[in-house]
Regions:
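Structured binding/interaction patches within domain cores
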Residues: 1-164
């Protein structure tokens, strides 16, 4: 059974919980890269300087966890105030990564993308253009970041998925 098949067999709440767990485990990769300082970069379109807050990924994880725990009748407020505001913080950096305006080590980039995809999943659910669930993509990216960053090996990930 492939990783995707195993993850697809889980209920949605378990998939999201697994994605959050892996992303929290990968957070030291991001923190090691930022070392508590904003990431600065210049975009190639208008040569404007941008900053990424060093706590952006931690705030994203916390906001998603708060959103999940919120009573159903308050989730729309959580969505509007917390998650959608965070999503706008990802817009410019995602474009700049795709335009190669900034180059990060692969584990850092994967951790950043995993946070973005989990946030998008939490806001609107859905799939990628090639049919993968956004939450699966986030899990896969976080797991890849953990492996490439030397934090977790494949067999440990398999055990973690089985425990979920």
């Amino acid at each position: 059974m492939t990783l995707e098949d195993r993850i697809e067999s889980l209920p949605d709440a378990c998939r999201t919980a697994l994605a959050l767990r892996l992303l929290r485990m990968a957070l030291p990769i991001w923190d090691g890269h930022t070392q508590g300082h904003p990431v600065r970069y210049r975009d190639s379109v208008v040569a404007m300087e941008h900053r990424i807050a060093p706590d952006m990924l931690a705030r994203t994880i916390d906001a998603i966890e708060r959103h999940i725990r919120a009573p159903w009748f308050l989730r729309w407020l959580s969505l509007r105030i917390g998650l959608m505001r965070l999503a706008t913080e990802f817009d410019d950096p995602i474009v700049s990564l795709q335009d190669l305006d900034m180059e990060w080590p692969e584990p850092v980039k994967l951790t950043f993308y995993a946070a973005h995809n989990l946030l998008e999943h939490s806001i609107k659910g859905g799939h990628t253009y090639d049919g993968h669930r956004l939450v699966y993509v986030s899990i896969n990216q976080a797991a890849d970041a953990l492996e490439r960053g030397g934090i977790m090996e494949t067999h440990e990930l398999d055990m973690l998925v089985r425990e979920t």
